[in-house]
């Protein structure tokens, strides 16, 4: 089963396997350290919360070591799940910088 990541509009923008986050095309874009989301370089971005990458306003989250990456098979788009907001800004796009 694919673990999708959605944006505020409800569109699937990525997915995660093990500790890696991928764009829908299979390109690795980030890594997980528990619920904390980091760029591949180790820089903190936000938290995985309710299948979204959001800024929960945590401060002083340390960088983590860069991780070896692999490309994944592109994910099939599950369709829109409906717009959802949990009161935290969606920051998935920061992984694509």
Name these PLM-found stretches.
Residues 1-23:
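N-terminal leader/targeting segments and the first structural element of proteins
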Residues 1-3, 43-97:
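Long terminal segments
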Residues 21, 37-39, 53-55:
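Generic recognition of long tandem-repeat/solenoid scaffolds
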């Amino acid at each position: 089963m694919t673990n999708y990541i959605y944006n505020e509009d409800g569109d699937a923008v990525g997915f995660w396997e093990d500790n890696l986050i991928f764009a829908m095309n299979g390109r690795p874009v980030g890594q997980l350290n528990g619920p904390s989301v980091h760029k591949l370089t180790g820089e903190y971005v936000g938290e995985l919360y309710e299948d979204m990458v959001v800024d929960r306003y945590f401060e002083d989250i340390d960088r983590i070591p860069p991780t070896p990456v692999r490309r994944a098979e592109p994910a099939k788009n599950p369709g829109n799940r409906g717009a959802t907001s949990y009161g935290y800004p969606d920051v998935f796009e920061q992984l694509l910088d």
